[in-house]
Amino acid sequence: MQAIIFDFDGTLVDSLPTVVAIANAHAPDFGYDPIDERDYAQLRQWSSRTIVRRAGLSPWQQARLLQRVQRQLGDCLPALQLFPGVADLLAQLRSRSLCLGILSSNSRQNIEAFLQRQGLRSLFSVVQAGTPILSKRRALSQLVAREGWQPAAVMYVGDETRDVEAARQVGLIAVAVTWGFNDRQSLVAACPDWLLETPSDLLQAVTQLMRQ
């Protein structure tokens, strides 16, 4: 094992309820239906591609909405928290001399500000932000190559089926977490190498892989 790359929203940070609230506020401007509690359960079964298609947003509208959501999410940073157990997990992983990184569709400004506020920035050797909503494959491949890591010795940890797909396409160890956006059934169908129920499960997976 050389490195572990994390998604940000829904994997490290419990930001999805805030993102949904912001997206709902912009629904009238973009012509899609706001998400209620009943819709959210259905939404967790869909890929990002399906959500965008059903919303009927053009590429220009997608970019504009993402910019608005990221800007308002930045205003909400003081209220956002790590998922329970994540801070301890990150510290333990770094103590094993593993490189830690973040690759996310969120903005660099938001990610850096949150990490600094939480006192976690020094744990990460690389932060790559602003990746496309629908596919992270190219950005993930470029990051691994730039850092000189061997794909088979790198984990990508995310909460969406698109994260699993991107990791598998690049030849990384695909790790899915069940506490984020996509539900467990959808993640199982995406066939990750590891499916985690709690942050401590990742430490167990890493321990097992490092013994091989």
Curated annotation (Swiss-Prot):
InterPro entries, sorted: HAD-like_hydrolase_sf, HAD-like_sf, HAD-SF_hydro_IA, HAD_2, HAD_sf, PGP-like_dom2
Catalytic activity: 2-phosphoglycolate + H2O = glycolate + phosphate
Keyword Membrane: no
Requisite cofactors: Mg(2+)
Binding site for Mg(2+): D7, D9, D159
Active site residues of this protein: D7
GO cellular component, one term: cytosol
EC annotation from Swiss-Prot or TrEMBL: 3.1.3.18
Keyword Transferase listed: no
BP term (GO), one: DNA repair
Enzyme class, first EC level, given as a word: hydrolase
Keywords carried by this UniProt record: Calvin cycle, Carbohydrate metabolism, Hydrolase, Magnesium, Metal-binding, Photosynthesis
Listed pathway(s): Organic acid metabolism; glycolate biosynthesis; glycolate from 2-phosphoglycolate: step 1/1
GO MF annotations in UniProt: metal ion binding; phosphoglycolate phosphatase activity
SUPFAM superfamilies (alphabetical): HAD-like
Family: Belongs to the HAD-like hydrolase superfamily. CbbY/CbbZ/Gph/YieH family.
Function of the protein: Specifically catalyzes the dephosphorylation of 2-phosphoglycolate.
PANTHER family recorded: PHOSPHOGLYCOLATE PHOSPHATASE
Name recorded for this polypeptide: Phosphoglycolate phosphatase
Species whose genome carries this gene: Synechococcus elongatus (strain ATCC 33912 / PCC 7942 / FACHB-805)
